[in-house]
Amino acid sequence: MFLIDMFNKKTILPDAATALPGREEEIPTATTHFVSGRPLQGPYPEGMKKVLFGMGCFWGAERLLWEIPGVYVTAAGYSGGLTPNPTYQETTTGLTGHTEVVLVVYDPAKVSLQRLLKTFFEEHDPTQGMRQGNDVGTTYRSAIYVYDEEQLAEANAARNAFQKALRVYNHDREITTEIAKAGPFYFAEDYHQQYLAKNPDGYCGLRGTGVSCPIGA
């Protein structure tokens, strides 16, 4: 019964009354990207755009995304919840409401949002609700958080296109990806940043559906 209760708590989003209080102070993290040496927290060059992707554990997702040409910098962090400046330990309780996300700062002149969305939908399973593979909890839910209306429209169109593609291949599950305007983004602790560059044999839980997303190039 205890294990069932713990499972249920980790898969139900908290409300304002049950969310952890957090703190005013930012959690210390790296200042530069371990791979590229670029500023992790900005300022970013003029013309760059941002998007947040939740694909389960952010270690593998971040590596996947920093390797895409046209991506200026990436960072692991937390978003979509209620608790200000959460720690990793707090997010794993399910009581912050946040999901693990990767901040992607990209040059739209070199890589389109469609290209990024195609990678997002193909490289994880966006139909699993409050989990990704063996990683269970609200902190592993699929999410896209955007910064303007144009991005929002593109994200919704990509979701619809991928849902149709899933049905063609007899996948009857519904996409559960949360798509919304971005709220606060909180940088994860230093040891999470570019984790798989520092630990090449570390855990990567990315598993796609095997279905192509029919958008972009």
UniProtKB/Swiss-Prot annotation:
Task: Report any one BP term from Gene Ontology.
Answer: cellular response to oxidative stress
Q: Name the top EC class.
A: oxidoreductase
Q: What is its EC number?
A: 1.8.4.11
Active-site residues annotated for this sequence = C57
Under catalytic activity, the entry for this protein gives: L-methionyl-[protein] + [thioredoxin]-disulfide + H2O = L-methionyl-(S)-S-oxide-[protein] + [thioredoxin]-dithiol; [thioredoxin]-disulfide + L-methionine + H2O = L-methionine (S)-S-oxide + [thioredoxin]-dithiol
Role description: Has an important function as a repair enzyme for proteins that have been inactivated by oxidation. Catalyzes the reversible oxidation-reduction of methionine sulfoxide in proteins to methionine.
Quote the protein name from its UniProt record.
Peptide methionine sulfoxide reductase MsrA 1
